[in-house]
Amino acid sequence: LSRDTSLGAIRPDLEQVWKTSNEVAAICYAVAKQAFGRQPDEAMMAGLLHSIGRLYILMHAHQNDPTMRQDPAFAETLETWQPIIGKAILEAWGLPQRICDAVENQDYLLDGGSAELEPLTRLLSAAKLRHRLEVEPELRLQHPDAEFLLGSVNLGKGSFMDLVAVSQADIASMQQALAA
């Protein structure tokens, strides 16, 4: 994709998908390793693929109607549909159902979802929200309870936020490895 000149108009969006996916994957990997001591690769895979639906929609819009992206409703449609489309793609690829379900429910924290969801889903949703809070400061205004929501996520050996705090070196190392 990096060499395809026909993607010029959406290149910044594609680069953002790649960067976000890598950063969320690094958080998922390091926290899963700390929380569960097992399956960090599965958590990393969920993080890497959580935006596959966004990638599909962006490519489809670019190839079929590039003006679609100027429609004011496009951003909301993209946010609403990307987890559903992502799950469908991952199921078609035969990925484990836990990963597919986590991708579908990646926004459960902000959507007021249940704390009874699978640990991988809670982890992915928390990692995505934490990343968004770092790169979208306005999100704190839209969701003043976002920090509280993150603090309420418990995984294995502790709270998500405590696990992130003790995993900072692993997160940074994994982000660097994925970005290379």
Question: Where in the sequence are the language-model features?
Answer:
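Acidic/His-rich, divalent-metal-binding segments that scaffold phosphate/diphosphate chemistry
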Residues: L1-I84, E91, G113-R122, H131
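Divalent metal-dependent phosphate-bond-processing catalytic cores, especially two-metal-ion Mg2+/Mn2+ enzymes
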Residues: Q34, I89-D101, G113-A180
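A short structural micro-motif
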Residues: L1-S2, Y108-D111, D170
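Short alpha-helical "patches" and their helix-cap loops
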Residues: A9-L14, D65-T77, D101-N105, P137-L155
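Beta-strand segments within the central parallel beta-sheet cores of soluble alpha/beta enzyme folds
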Residues: E42-A46, C100-N105
